[in-house]
């Protein structure tokens, strides 16, 4: 297995485990076992469990941004969406909302990431901020409310 393939498999298995059991309940050994490698080999790819978690957050956040940009919703910069939403028809708005909902519901990586963030927001101030930005503030702003 190539190093990049192994690295991605580590991230995939870590997300699977973190989203079902939480970060603290998962050991590096369990991640390595799920990948099919020995724990010391995992350290050739990531220096720590926290580094795996950080890479996972960065990777999935980037994927989410790329994917949502394809439907012209700029999740990192809501002001970019003002022209989109001021001139949108009701049917087009419905279609964008449907696409986002379908994507969030049926994309396994995004679904697991959202579940993991829901659990881990209480452990990490950075994740709490990211969770609040991505899921709370955006919903509040879409309803015309501010925190």
Model-derived features with residue positions:
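Solvent-exposed, amphipathic alpha-helical segments
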Residues: 13-20, 99, 113-116
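N-terminal intrinsically disordered/low-complexity leader segments
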Residues: 1-5, 75-77
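An amphipathic alpha-helix signature
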Residues: 11, 94, 98, 140-147
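Helix-turn-helix
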Residues: 9, 13, 17-59
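Hydrophobic alpha-helical connector segments
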Residues: 55, 69-108
């Amino acid at each position: 297995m190539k190093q990049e393939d192994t690295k991605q498999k580590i991230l995939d298995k870590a997300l699977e485990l973190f989203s079902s059991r939480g970060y603290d309940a998962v050991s590096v050994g369990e991640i390595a076992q799920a990948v099919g490698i020995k724990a010391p080999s995992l350290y050739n790819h990531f220096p720590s469990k926290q580094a795996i978690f950080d890479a996972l957050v960065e990777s999935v956040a980037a994927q989410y941004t790329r994917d949502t940009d394809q439907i012209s919703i700029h999740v990192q910069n809501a002001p970019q969406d003002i022209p989109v939403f001021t001139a949108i028809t009701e049917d087009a708005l419905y279609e964008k909302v449907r696409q986002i909902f379908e994507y969030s519901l049926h994309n396994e990586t995004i679904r697991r990431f959202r579940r993991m963030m829901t659990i881990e927001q209480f452990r990490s101030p950075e994740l709490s901020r990211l969770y609040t930005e991505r899921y709370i503030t955006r919903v509040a702003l879409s309803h015309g409310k501010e925190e």
